[in-house]
Amino acid sequence: MKPWLLLVLLCAAAPASARTAFQARCEDTIGQSVSVMSSKQNGYRIDNSYSFHGLSAMKGERAPGSYVLGLTRTESQVRIGIQGRMLSDPATGYECVAPRLEVHMTYLPIVVYVGREFRPGTCAYREILAHELRHRDIYLNALPRAEKVVSDALARRFQGKPLYAPGGQARNLLQREIDTGWMPFIKREMEKVERLQAAIDTPREYARLGKVCAGEVQSLIRPAKSKRTT
């Protein structure tokens, strides 16, 4: 995070007996820095409208000659709102702010795709769906973990103390810290889920899916390979 904020926060964290009059007024009247976390699970739906050719195109990069039989997709979203009281000190030319950060993290509704070549109720459909539901569960479980990591990091950073800056700069510098530090940090934390997703899609798992149900999967995709419809 930004060095100026770190320095003035350390000054603000000095023992109460060493506080300046301005520090005492700030800490005693404008309240504490607060981070309010919220997250929302938006559920999931199953979509059987795409062919495996369409799903392969949707996924994009993949191993040569491979096909995508099912796919699970969502998108992370982060919003950070800033409020808080401020005081100015004409004698020192400094100001203090007790920020209230409201952080909202969510994934858009998860869409679980299964190629339309695989009819619901068949063995192949059940196997492909079971594989994709593992991906769904990773997304559902990732959100509370990411929320805790972010909450702990914010608590360490702000320590419930006001922040100090030269007059007229506190809000802009705080916004800059949010934009260039916290927003990228939170997005990276939410994107870590993709490494867990990749760990499911191993060559061994793909080979297993190709052989399940007495070869039903291969028997369904073989005649469809030449059609290439979405």
Where are these regions (language model features)?
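Cleaved targeting-peptide boundary
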Residues: 18-26
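Sec-dependent signal peptide recognition
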Residues: 2-7
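Catalytic Zn2+-binding segment of zinc metalloproteases
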Residues: 133-150
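Active-site alpha-helix of zinc metalloproteases
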Residues: 122-127, 136
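Family-specific functional microsites
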Residues: 148, 155-156
